[in-house]
Swiss-Prot record:
The lineage of its organism: Bacteria, Bacillati, Actinomycetota, Actinomycetes, Micrococcales. It catalyses: cytidine(1402) in 16S rRNA + S-adenosyl-L-methionine = N(4)-methylcytidine(1402) in 16S rRNA + S-adenosyl-L-homocysteine + H(+). Its EC number is 2.1.1.199. Transmembrane segments: none annotated. Its main location: cytoplasm. Keywords: Cytoplasm, Methyltransferase, rRNA processing, S-adenosyl-L-methionine, Transferase. GO terms for cellular component: cytoplasm. It is found in: Cytoplasm. InterPro entries: RsmH, SAM-dep_MeTrfase_MraW_recog, SAM-dependent_MTases_sf. PANTHER family: 12S RRNA N4-METHYLCYTIDINE METHYLTRANSFERASE (PTHR11265:SF0), S-ADENOSYL-METHYLTRANSFERASE MRAW (PTHR11265). The gene is rsmH. Belongs to the methyltransferase superfamily. RsmH family. Pfam families: Methyltransf_5 (PF01795). One of its GO terms (molecular function) is rRNA (cytosine-N4-)-methyltransferase activity. This is Ribosomal RNA small subunit methyltransferase H.
Amino acid sequence: MEEQDAAKPTSERHVPVLKDRCINLLAPGFEAARKRGERPVAIDATLGMGGHSEAMLQRFPDLHLVGIDRDEEALALAGARLEPFSDRTDLVHAVYDEIEDVLLDLGVPEVHGILMDLGVSSLQLDERERGFAYSYDAPLDMRMDTSRGQTAADVVNNYSEDELVRIIRKWGEEKFAGRIANRIVNARAEKPFATTGELVEQIRSVVPAAAAKSGGHPAKRTFQALRIEVNEELDVLERAVPAAVAATAMGGRIVVMSYHSLEDKIVKSVFQAGSKSSAPLGFPVELEEHKPELKTITKGTEVPTAAEIAENPRAASARLRAVERIKQRRDA
C-alpha cells in the first residue's frame, strides 16, 4: 500500500493536517455571519494543494473562499482540485501577509474565518527538485515562490560565517551552528554548494553522531534555518497574524497551525495581546476602546491525537491555536 501511495501524485496522497478539527473551530464564525444575514467568507491563507479548502467548501455550500499561496505550482494544483467550486472561490498568487491588499483587490470588506497552516507544504517536501528535503539530493533552492528571491545556495555560498552562525542558531535553534557555519565556509572555498546532498555531507562531518541519534537528522535544524531565511517566513508571519486579526469580522475566527516553537511564539504573542484589556493598570473603569478584541478558543496549544497522527504522520509536530473576534473592527 505504501509503495502504491508513493507512486501517486502528491495531490492525491495529500491528507490535510487536523482537517476536521480546524473546520469545526471555524464553523461558528460562519454561523455568526449567517445570523447577521451575511454570506460567510473564509480565507485559506496558506492554500497549498487545497485540501482544507475543499473540505470547507464541501461542508458549507454557502461559503465563499479566498485562497492565497505564494507557490504558483501549488496554486495550479489547488485550482484543479477546487474547479467544482470555481463559482465560490478566488485563488490569488500572493504571500499571506498581503491579506489586506488581496481583500481590497477583491472588494471584500471583511471575512468570517481565516486558516493558516504554516511551514513547508507536502508538495514542497515531496517535489525533490525544490530542495526542501535533506533525505535526497536535489538543487539547493528552498524557495516557496520560485519566480523570485534568493535560493538556499545563494545563502550558503555568499553569507559570511558570522551571518551563517546567526541564522542557523536563531532560525534552526542548532547548538552546533558555529561548527556547521565554519565547515560550510571552508567547503565552499574549494567548490560552491549546488545541491542538498553536498550540504548534508558537510553537516554530517561536524555534527557528533550522538547528537544526531537524539536530535534527529543532523541536517534537520540547518535546513529549517535556511528555509526560514530564504522565504523570510517569520518576518512574514509577524505581519500576517495582525493582518488576519484586522480582517476578521465580529464573531469570526482565526485558526493557526504551527510546527515549531519560533512560529508558535509569534502566534501566541499576537493572540494573547489581543485577548487582554488595554486599560492602564489600576484604571477604575474599562472603556470600550480598552476592551479586548479577541477571545481565546483553544486552551494554550492543542496537539494532534494519536488517531490524527496515524491519518497523517506530518501532523505529529502541529500545534494549533484559535481565537474569535469579540469586538467590532475599528473600520467596521
